[in-house]
Amino acid sequence: MKIHCFLFALFIFLSSLYMQAEGTAGKWSERYNFTAITMDEGLPHNFVDDILKDSQGFLWIATRGEGIARYDGYEFTAFHMGNTRIKLRSNFINKLCEDNFKRIWAVSEMGIDILDIQTMQTVQVTDMKDKLISLCNRPSHLILHSKAGNIWVCSENNLFKITFDKQGDIKQIIKTCEVPAGESIRTICEVEDYLWINYKDGIYRIKESAMEVQEPTFISSALQLPGVSIQVICRKENEIWIGSAQGLFRYNMDTELMKHYMYDPNDNSSLSQNFITDIAETGEHTMLVATLKGINLYNALTDNFERINKDTGEGE
């Protein structure tokens, strides 16, 4: 399970605060404004596992201990097990996504909760075959909304695909992949018509259009990473960025070349730490790499990083 000590700051930064500052010479971070929102401002819990910006512009925050919080820029609305009006299955939420019908899907070890972002109520999605009830009761740790409009759920060592009709009712629930017992899919990244996943000792892919169980297929020998604990996969143009517990990898899909970035105690422009918790791209196409010791802004011109953490604030 990923540990996101700085993820909340990262996604607040992503949401709307990458406005250019005047006088951008100097450090890369001087182009941006930063803010921090903590429990002092009403955040229910400082341990955040995921953040989602919904189609209406609100932030939904998955916490490890206090359920889900929706942030409107001014205050938080909380959803948790102790809420008498909207009761969640668990206070320990792993991941969030929004479907095409303005519903938030939240996965946890206790199953799946579905929230309507307009009514702010939990909802029961119509499923003629009643497969969703069974799936919602299974422990789940990962969820993805694909470009085709499907929901992908990782539950234990299985990957399920949920398709919908035009009204938003369940059309089909298909088990598309099963990994060996004791293993789990920790990350999914959509790349064109495929979903790239961590599998065995590297990264493999499955077809998004799959309607039956399929074996993940080999991509490249460069993506075989024995001994590497892959945490996150992120695509930027023709490159795949891979965050792991052993540093950051950057894979070029055209040349199949791989570069490995690691923390160097003698180089302040290296990563701040080797355990990568998340990777994201700003609206200005800057890559952000979150570690257990802060955020790293990637400078494509110099092929190195500028560190942002709670102590420096303005980088180092």
Q: Which residue stretches match the model-derived regions?
A:
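Carboxylate-rich, polar loop motifs that coordinate divalent cations or form catalytic acidic clusters
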Residues: 1-316
